Swiss-Prot record:
Gene3D superfamilies: Diaminopimelate Epimerase, Chain A, domain 1 (3.10.310.10)
Induction comment: Is up-regulated when the bacterium is grown on t4LHyp or t3LHyp as sole carbon source.
Active site (catalytic residues): C85, C235
Taxonomic source organism: Roseibium aggregatum (strain ATCC 25650 / DSM 13394 / JCM 20685 / NBRC 16684 / NCIMB 2208 / IAM 12614 / B1)
The protein's name: 4-hydroxyproline 2-epimerase
InterPro entries xrefs: Pro_racemase_fam
Catalyzed reactions: trans-4-hydroxy-L-proline = cis-4-hydroxy-D-proline
Keywords, in A-Z order: Isomerase
Free-text function comment from the UniProt entry: Catalyzes the epimerization of trans-4-hydroxy-L-proline (t4LHyp) to cis-4-hydroxy-D-proline (c4DHyp). May be involved in a degradation pathway of t4LHyp, which would allow L.aggregata to grow on t4LHyp as a sole carbon source. Displays no proline racemase activity.
Membership in a protein family: Belongs to the proline racemase family.
């Protein structure tokens, strides 16, 4: 199985070029559902130890249903499929450019939640025009064990987020473990309180905000991903959810740039335009770098060929 590894603002992506499972025909959403239902061992083998680690996002290239798209892609992590992934889309654009499959300019990628457009600006810089994002609920308060009441917004940016404006813990590298523990507790509190996304969807990402360390940035964040890892990047879908909240509050004008900093200090430049459904169409600009071109080997005698799951 050939893969290309990259990182976007510190967050890793592994693009699977060949050797993936046969997902049959149908829409990309149908094929993504088939991947999650029937091929979890494949996903685990690609992103988990001993070949990977819990922060890697997999990106399986598949034929697009829409012939106008340069690629079809299904994103997955160490737990499940992802409807959309901003950092991995930037990484995919840079990977395809590295392979000579796309050139600078506008391109379309088909994802399970819709078509996204990218602008390949140079060999390492990509702007992603994401799907329409929106806020579902404002100022939702839940009682968090050992912490007390925590208030945040519920918003969609390609995945479901609970966004907390003022983190009770400083967003520093030294606090990664307590920040992870806190966000896991918040997610559990949401589940116990029955707080969900649209149609009962699981809110699988928790996003905390605080003051930026970079004087050019407006905010710093910490993002808990579904499998319990933290996002090294500012999180593209999380930025999209944040833009939806800023727009709904009248705190950011259409087309106005906003610099979002991650917990490791990397940044995305983000902005939005009004969406046709009342939400926002986010644009996320960041940089990615290819780190390896590898062949994954699966030995039938290897007891951990499908990954280590604890």
């Amino acid at each position: 199985m050939r893969v290309i590894d990259s990182h976007t603002a510190g967050e890793p992506t592994r693009v699977v070029l060949d050797g993936g499972p046969d997902l049959g025909s149908g829409t990309l959403a149908e094929r993504a559902a088939r991947l999650e239902a029937e091929h979890l061992d494949f996903c685990a083998s690609v992103v988990l130890e001993p070949r990977g680690h819990d922060a890697i996002i997999g990106a399986l290239l598949v034929p697009p249903s829409d012939p106008a798209c340069a690629a079809g892609v299904i994103y997955f992590n160490n737990l499940q499929n992802l409807g959309m992934c901003g950092h991995a889309t930037i990484g995919l654009g840079v990977t395809l450019a590295h392979l000579g499959r796309i050139r600078p300019g506008r391109h379309r990628f088909e994802t399970p939640v819709g078509v996204v457009e990218i602008d390949l600006i140079d060999a390492n810089t990509v702007s992603v025009v994401n799907i329409e994002s929106y806020r579902l609920a404002k100022d939702v308060t839940v009682e968090v064990e050992g912490v007390g009441p925590v208030t945040g917004d519920v918003a969609w940016g390609g995945n479901w987020f609970f966004l907390v404006k003022n983190s009770p813990i400083a967003l520093t590298g030294a606090n990664i473990r307590p920040l992870t523990d806190l966000t896991l507790k918040i997610r559990t509190a949401l589940e116990k309180a029955g707080v969900t996304g649209k149609d009962g969807a699981w809110i699988d990402h928790i996003e905390l905000f605080g003051p930026a360390e970079d004087p050019a940035a407006q905010s710093r964040n910490f993002v808990l991903c579904p499998g319990g890892a933290y996002d090294r990047s500012p999180c593209g879908t999380g930025c999209s959810a944040k833009l939806a909240c800023l727009a709904a509050d009248g705190a950011l004008a259409p087309g106005q740039d906003y610099l979002q900093e991650s917990v490791i200090g990397s940044t995305y430049k983000i902005s939005y335009q009004p969406g046709p459904g009342g939400g926002v169409i986010p644009t996320i600009t960041g940089q990615a770098f290819v780190t390896s071109d590898a062949t994954l080997i699966f030995n039938p005698a290897d007891p951990y060929r499908s990954g280590i799951r604890l």
